[in-house]
Amino acid sequence: MWIISSNPKYVDISGQQLCDMLREGGEADNVLMTLSMRRYQQMDIAFAAAKGEGCWRHFLEPDFMNHVSREDDISKLTYIKEMFVGHHINYEVNKCTEIVLPVKFDLKWSTYIWDYSRTKIFVLDPTMHNGDESDKEIQQRHRKVADELHGSIELCIKSFFIGWEPDMRRWNTCFPKGLVTGICERKDTWIYATHLARNWMGTKLKRDVNPGDGIMHARMNLLVDLLGTEDNIGHLPKRYKDCLFPKKDKQNICCRN
């Protein structure tokens, strides 16, 4: 396995699986989406630390949605609890202003963002303006899902934290426009969802991604991000290790140890 991550639960992925999913037209599974969210969290932590700041957003994993949709008692599930608290989380989740969750339903991926500073849920659906059905119909389905997830996140906060009591009433669910140029095909919704999760800056995107070459570029960017996963206990081929972790960095690590 090229990448193995053990917190908050064990997941792994092989080089062949990465190749199959990240090639043109490849579709991601829950494992790839989970590893992507974990990697984005690591990158956010490093960025915040470099600026001497705290982490400002918290990424949840896609299985959160799966447990909610099955009507599991999420307040009793260790895996769900460890998405919010645990020794592997080295920042204060209760001080994050956003919670980010990749959501899959109707065989398509979207990104949901809970913005605590604005008391809004942003639903970033890359297929919203494809034109194959009305925006109203799509929004109605999303609102139902968002309401269920909203109540579940509120339950998790009440169950897993002491002293964090955000007002979760009367939040608005918003559907930003202009996220995608052109038509987003179903097979590409997952790469848009990861891009939107990474690049949403509160009211707009930091970087756009367009159909065609832009999609393939986003896939390759994600590959580089994933191969740089910290605390990876998998067996990454030496040629990639040498590219991602130059000898100079290895020597510095040895000296520090």
Residue ranges with predicted function:
Residues 1-257:
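Enzymes acting in ubiquitin/UBL processing and closely related pathways
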